[in-house]
């Protein structure tokens, strides 16, 4: 099945056109190539009626600029088809020249100005800068839908947590590749935003780089698998949480009763939270993130066979080794709203590393992950 075909299968499962985030595990792994591939082909697989429904496009953060702001390397531009709807900040829209026509304003602002809804009127590159908070990213997707977009693609990154959230999109395509090994280009969280994958990389990055293609591929596979594991947590089976908008952190007891943790935020109160946790609790429900502080407090306790329920996989902010240790103890991470990782795209090239054989990289990722893997350049 092709990559667009996987999206159409997701549509059939949901009964509606899926909103999808394209998320890169690092710089230069082919995220924009994946985005352009989908923008070009979404109307070509399946029913021809799809091509009559405008695609919506936004970014959690900024993308589509000519040169990377950190590395100064040229970046692939974003080419949405004419008729598409784009949510982007004012100065980014101005830099897109005559490609965009204003449709409507939004209540959201970024450092590049007010985010507006624009229609693509010329086949030229556009620059996209959208809001970065979870609520505003979700609101932007809703506004694109309201103005006629049938499906919204979100240009994201793994260190922009909102881009992969189940509150924003109904599926994620993860772009990965050999640039994960590049100094600077592949180290996530360099801005200090220690999110899901940057925690994973922080735990895995210290290993010396392998000397052979096979060894380097194995390192990329391990890092990618860590990201996928932390993002795609299984759904919580606790029926008491089904459909709940329960805002509190607390304990789920046998029989489904819920006891809230009254002190509030758990970010710096891991030991206090674990001491409070009732002995009979079946699950610890976290309103926000599972931090390293809380995870270490759980490991230091004698708790076993306890479910740890977070909103979704973007709320896992502990180190990858800590994540694995929790599972080994029987402290199993679950999500109230699971993230559906639909596919992996693989890039065998990197700015600062020799290219590895595409077939070898794709095969290694395919063997390690229960997901379809594509090299969209070698096998479009």
Show the residue positions of the predicted features:
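A noncatalytic interaction/capping subdomain that flanks phosphate/NTP-handling catalytic cores
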Residues: 1-10, 63, 99-122, 336-344, ...
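Walker A (P-loop) phosphate-binding motif
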Residues: 3-65
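Short, basic, glycine/proline-bearing loop/turn elements
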Residues: 19-25, 118-130
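Hydrophobic/aromatic beta-strand patches that form the interior of the parallel beta-sheet core
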Residues: 20, 56-58, 170-173, 342-345, ...
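Short, glycine/acidic-enriched capping/hinge loops at junctions between secondary-structure elements
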Residues: 32-35, 66-70, 164, 184-186
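N-terminal phosphate/diphosphate-binding loop that engages ATP/GTP or pyrophosphate donors
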Residues: 38-120, 331, 367
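A generic structural motif
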Residues: 57-60, 309-314, 372-380
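Conserved catalytic-core segment of NTP-binding enzymes
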Residues: 133, 137-367
């Amino acid at each position: 099945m092709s990559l667009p075909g996987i999206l159409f299968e997701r549509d059939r499962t949901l009964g509606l056109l899926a909103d999808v985030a394209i998320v890169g595990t690092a710089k230069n792994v082919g995220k924009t190539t994946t985005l352009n591939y989908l923008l070009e082909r979404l109307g070509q697989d399946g029913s021809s009626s799809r091509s009559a429904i405008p695609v919506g496009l936004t970014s959690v953060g900024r993308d589509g600029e000519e040169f990377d702001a950190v590395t100064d390397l040229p970046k692939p531009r974003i080419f949405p088809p004419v008729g598409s709807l784009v949510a982007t900040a004012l100065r980014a829209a101005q830099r897109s020249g005559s490609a965009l026509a204003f449709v409507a304003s939004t209540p959201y602002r970024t450092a590049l100005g007010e985010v507006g809804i624009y229609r693509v009127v010329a086949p030229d590159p556009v620059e996209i800068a959208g809001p970065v908070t979870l609520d505003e990213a979700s609101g932007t997707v809703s506004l694109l839908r309201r103005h006629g977009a049938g499906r919204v693609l979100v240009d994201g990154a793994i260190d922009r947590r909102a881009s992969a959230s189940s509150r924003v999109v109904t599926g994620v395509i993860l772009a990965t590749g050999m640039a994960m090994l590049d100094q600077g280009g592949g180290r996530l969280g360099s801005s200090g935003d220690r999110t899901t994958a940057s925690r994973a990389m922080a735990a895995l990055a210290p290993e010396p780089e392998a000397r052979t293609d096979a060894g380097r591929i194995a390192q990329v596979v391990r890092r990618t698998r860590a990201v996928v594991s932390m993002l795609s947590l299984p759904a919580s089976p606790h029926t008491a949480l089904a459909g709940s908008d329960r805002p509190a952190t607390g304990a789920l007891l046998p029989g489904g009763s819920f006891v809230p943790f009254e002190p509030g935020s758990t970010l710096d109160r891991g030991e206090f939270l674990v001491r409070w946790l009732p002995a009979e609790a079946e699950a610890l429900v976290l309103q926000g993130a599972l931090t390293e502080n809380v995870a270490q407090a759980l490991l230091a306790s004698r708790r076993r066979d306890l479910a740890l329920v977070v909103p979704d996989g973007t709320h896992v902010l502990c180190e990858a080794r800590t994540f694995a240790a929790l599972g080994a103890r029987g402290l199993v991470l679950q999500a109230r709203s699971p993230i559906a990782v639909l596919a992996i795209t693989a890039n065998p090239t990197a700015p600062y590393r020799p290219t590895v054989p595409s077939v070898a990289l794709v095969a290694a990722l395919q063997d390690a992950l229960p997901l379809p893997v594509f090299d969209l350049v070698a096998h479009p």
